[in-house]
């Protein structure tokens, strides 16, 4: 099964750039933007501007099984790239 990757760059509340990918089974920008905002809120970055300018469809790909399970459970998976908070263990 192919999943859809939305490349996302947003300005954080402190001004630095947060770069991450939203991976979902829906090839829909509105849904990807909603997932991006949900994840940003979960890391304490509220009310950031996220539009189709910041969250753009990039490509479709297959994903590892654990990623697919998370997508099927939560609707999406975030691949943290640059400027993202350190993952808590």
Predicted regions, residues:
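Short, charged/polar N-terminal "headpieces" of proteins
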Residues: 1-18
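Generic structural hydrophobic/aromatic packing signal, biased to beta-strands
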Residues: 6-8, 22, 36, 78
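Generic structural motif
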Residues: 11-13, 25-27, 81
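Short, flexible N-terminal segments of the mature chain
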Residues: 17-43
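Acidic, low-complexity intrinsically disordered segments
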Residues: 35-89
């Amino acid at each position: 099964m192919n999943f859809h990757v939305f490349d996302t760059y947003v300005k954080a509340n402190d001004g630095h750039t947060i770069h991450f990918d939203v991976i979902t089974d829906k090839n829909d920008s509105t849904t990807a933007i909603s997932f991006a905002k949900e994840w940003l809120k979960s890391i304490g970055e509220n009310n950031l501007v996220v539009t189709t300018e910041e969250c753009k469809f990039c490509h479709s790909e297959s994903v590892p099984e654990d990623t697919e399970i998370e997508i099927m459970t939560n609707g999406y998976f975030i691949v943290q790239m640059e400027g993202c908070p350190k993952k808590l263990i």
